């Protein structure tokens, strides 16, 4: 539940084909009932060169400015964003405390020091 109320965690709503419909730093959909389910955006982006060109040529639109979620730049200009569900757990690194936690986890990785 902490991720749901954490404004550093971006939540995403997807359609039945796992295309992004909306992002927010607040709980979406609104939890009017106890059946609300939340998906967290991991924030790992894969672009073709042409996609990067489109992203860089478009200016931030209103929702990107309001939510501080850069993927709104594409959604607001009519582009679709394919999401991929994963069961992997991730942590966000937004604060010095998060960085300490991430560093401690990396040091436990058997490949630490090789990357």
Residue ranges and their predicted role:
Residues 34-115:
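Conserved alpha/beta core of the MobA/IspD/sugar-nucleotide pyrophosphorylase nucleotidyltransferase superfamily
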């Amino acid at each position: 539940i902490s991720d749901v109320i954490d404004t550093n965690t971006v939540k995403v709503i997807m359609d039945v084909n796992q295309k992004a419909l909306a992002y927010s730093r607040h709980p979406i959909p609104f939890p009017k009932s106890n059946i609300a389910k939340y998906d967290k955006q991991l924030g790992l982006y894969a672009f073709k060169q042409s996609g990067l060109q489109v992203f860089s040529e478009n200016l931030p639109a209103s929702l990107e400015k309001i939510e501080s979620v850069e993927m709104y730049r594409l959604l607001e200009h009519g582009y679709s964003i394919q999401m991929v569900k994963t069961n992997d757990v991730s942590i966000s690194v937004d604060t010095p405390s998060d960085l300490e936690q991430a560093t401690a986890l990396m040091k436990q990785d058997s490949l630490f020091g090789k990357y």
